[in-house]
């Protein structure tokens, strides 16, 4: 009998849970509710909320909107968004994750200090990611974004550096970047770094590795847009090369199933539990048919 197990630690982080709960609460009142960007980087969950009435809009559409109610998702927004909302009489339902909110405030405080010309504010994160855009917005676009260790090489090591991180990035690579900067920065300037990675995300790593290593086959469930999903999937592959990224039951490859004794189903912080359960049931049904 093949064992199919869902990782108990996988699924929405508390920031996403709060955003979805706020959306459902408003929609239950029968109001017209807009969401600025996909509420979560998972197309199935976005579709479920769309069926409930949630209207997803982009920033250009947001600028044209007046006298409406708009949900801001967990990723956070730059200050400009709040200014537009005030000008256009838009009521904001703010679901920005408290971890992201604290980070925005820290970066803004750093930026407001008088020695700005003498230092670089650096954010380790994904260029263009919603959270990163919100963080860079705290510095009126002055912060430097680096996506990986290689990009740290283009920093000016003759100027002081203040390093922060997107909340969902890899802790291991963050520390590699810290060590690289320490080795290369001029002794005449200062380097301060702040591990601002969400602990709920970071703490998933060891448990996820253990889960992936304990099964013959892993199906990692995540939306293709999820930054966190890509990172966690890579962690699975490191300990179990027989790990496969899917975002729906339709993507289960039948040819992988014969000869395995245990199958693990896990996912990102943007993956709903109901979707992992749906995929687990689909796997069991396919095994029965074989």
Swiss-Prot record:
(2E)-4-hydroxy-3-methylbut-2-enyl diphosphate binds at residues 41, 75, 129, 167, 226-228, 270. Its cofactor is [4Fe-4S] cluster. The keyword Oxidoreductase applies. It catalyses: isopentenyl diphosphate + 2 oxidized [2Fe-2S]-[ferredoxin] + H2O = (2E)-4-hydroxy-3-methylbut-2-enyl diphosphate + 2 reduced [2Fe-2S]-[ferredoxin] + 2 H(+); dimethylallyl diphosphate + 2 oxidized [2Fe-2S]-[ferredoxin] + H2O = (2E)-4-hydroxy-3-methylbut-2-enyl diphosphate + 2 reduced [2Fe-2S]-[ferredoxin] + 2 H(+). Binds 1 [4Fe-4S] cluster per subunit. Isopentenyl diphosphate binds at residues 41, 75, 129, 226-228, 270. One of its GO terms (molecular function) is 4 iron, 4 sulfur cluster binding. The active site is at 131 (proton donor). The keyword Cytoplasm does not apply. Keywords: 4Fe-4S, Iron, Iron-sulfur, Isoprene biosynthesis, Metal-binding, Oxidoreductase. Pathway: Isoprenoid biosynthesis; dimethylallyl diphosphate biosynthesis; dimethylallyl diphosphate from (2E)-4-hydroxy-3-methylbutenyl diphosphate: step 1/1; Isoprenoid biosynthesis; isopentenyl diphosphate biosynthesis via DXP pathway; isopentenyl diphosphate from 1-deoxy-D-xylulose 5-phosphate: step 6/6. [4Fe-4S] cluster binds at residues 13, 97, 198. This is 4-hydroxy-3-methylbut-2-enyl diphosphate reductase.
């Amino acid at each position: 009998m093949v064992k199919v197990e869902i990782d108990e630690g996988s699924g929405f982080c508390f920031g996403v849970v709060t955003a979805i709960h706020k959306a459902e609460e408003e929609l239950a009142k029968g109001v017209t509710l807009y969401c600025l960007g996909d509420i979560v980087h998972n197309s199935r969950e976005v579709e479920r909320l769309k069926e409930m009435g949630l209207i997803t809009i982009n920033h250009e559409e947001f600028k044209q909107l007046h006298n409406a109610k708009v949900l801001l998702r967990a990723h956070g927004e730059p200050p400009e968004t709040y200014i537009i909302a005030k000008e256009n009489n838009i009521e904001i339902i703010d679901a920005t994750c408290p971890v992201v909110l604290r980070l925005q405030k820290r970066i803004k405080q750093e930026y407001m200090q008088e020695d700005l010309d003498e230092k670089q504010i650096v954010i380790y994160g994904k260029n263009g990611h919603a959270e990163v855009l919100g963080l860079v917005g705290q510095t009126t676009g002055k912060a430097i974004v680096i996506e990986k260790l290689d990009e740290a090489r283009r920093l000016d090591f003759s100027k002081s550096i203040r390093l922060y991180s997107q909340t969902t990035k890899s802790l291991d690579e963050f520390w590699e970047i810290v060590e690289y900067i320490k080795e290369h920065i001029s002794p005449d300037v200062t380097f301060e770094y702040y591990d601002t990675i969400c602990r709920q995300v970071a703490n998933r790593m060891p448990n996820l590795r253990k889960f992936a290593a304990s099964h013959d086959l892993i199906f990692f469930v995540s939306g293709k847009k999820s930054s966190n999903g890509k990172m966690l999937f890579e962690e699975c592959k490191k300990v179990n090369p027989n790990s496969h990224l899917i975002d729906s039951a339709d993507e289960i490859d039948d040819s992988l199933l014969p000869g395995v004794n245990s199958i693990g189903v896990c996912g990102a912080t943007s993956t709903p539990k109901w979707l992992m359960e749906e995929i687990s049931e689909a796997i069991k049904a396919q095994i029965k048919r074989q």
